[in-house]
Amino acid sequence: MAGTGEVYKGSDGVWGFRVKASTGQIIATDGGYGYTSKDDARATLQLLLQGDYAGPIYEIATLACGQEITEDTTLDSDLVCAGGPALVVAADNVTLDLGGYTVSASADTVGSGPGIVLQGVTGVTVRKGTVQNFGAAVVIAGGGNNVVQNLTCQDNVGSVGGDFGDGIVVDNSSENRIEGNTVRRNGPYSGISLLGESRHNQVLDNIVSDNNMLHLGDPSAGRQAMGIRMEGPKADHNTVSGNTVTGSGADGIVVLPTCIPGSEPECAGSPPNQHNLITNNISNDNGTSGRGDGIRLFTVANPVAPAHTTIRENVADENQTNGIAIDAAGNNNPGPTENRVIGNSAHGNGAYDGFDGNVNPRCDANVWEGNDFRSVNQRCVSGEPAPASGSRSDEV
């Protein structure tokens, strides 16, 4: 193959290679998932230049801001756009490979719209590059069974009155995989969000850090961003596993209560977010705005609380408020929440390592078993049988 080659290390730490023509234009790039070492990338590049490479090669396409992607596409340079969306994936079963390059909003349009939108598509992969300075880095809107992988999503900040303020958003979309991304300095909502009826999604092995940004245009709003949040309603059967979540303005990993507008009376009849699995995560040092838990099942008086959640084998240390917390169920819950907190470790948190706000009955129907906590707010959180309500020994 004519041309000269170069190897490069992407923002995700994975090595890849490119082939350049004599003009300096990139004419081919590796179409695989990258290499863990520089030597492996170089060896494969040499095979390509010798004509012996049998792996996938993607043709380089020159892209324009706002372009619709309808076929396999790899960036050949950075892309700077006057606001978002910068790129819209509008066809099923295609790969958008950023090739280690950066898609960003220009300095005067920071926070305006999303960077990359997957619009009602299935079977799409977006990978290997950086998306920054939009209202959100990547939005999966509808569709399903897509992959967002090995991206750096940073400095995406929502403006007042805008729809976003997140790193990666899954909006009414199911069976997607969000894996191996670095998601940092986004806000004021979250690093990664699952909104609406988003089911059977996998959020795996991401580094989610320092998501605590202010709203653009209103310095009094923001810094309440959550690391990973399942908002719903009907955000069910999702798996959040292997992530490292630190430095969130509010809570690290959160399942929120639900309230469908117009529900009568006061949220009654809203479906809970339920059957979600939170496992093998590290969620430390969250709550930089002054209040935040490592992992939280969040509710307030009227919205319907999360139910049937499993929180298993996580670490939640040094958070501003609690390590792992289940808020008291709201007034309109259709029945016991029946969450399970099993085999976790939490130490050095500001209030309690383990917290359950349900006091009548103690811990409701939630199960706390085999956890390593040094401080809890009531005995049932330690896995001990709760005494009769009203006893002086109810509290720890």
Regions found by a protein language model. Give the residues of each.
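Short N-terminal "domain-start" leader segments
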Residues: 1-23, 30-31, 39-42, 47-52, ...
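Short, tandemly repeated low-complexity microdomains enriched for cysteine and small residues
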Residues: 28-34, 56-60, 217-218, 255
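Short, T/G/N/S-enriched strand-turn elements that build extracellular solenoid repeat scaffolds
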Residues: 64-68, 83-90
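Beta-solenoid repeat scaffold
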Residues: 72, 86-102, 120-124
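Extracellular beta-strand/beta-solenoid scaffold signature
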Residues: 81-86, 109-117, 133-140, 157-171, ...
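Small-residue (G/S/T/A) turn/hinge positions that recur once per unit in extracellular repeat modules
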Residues: 91-94, 121, 143, 173, ...
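Leucine-rich solenoid repeat scaffolds
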Residues: 338-395
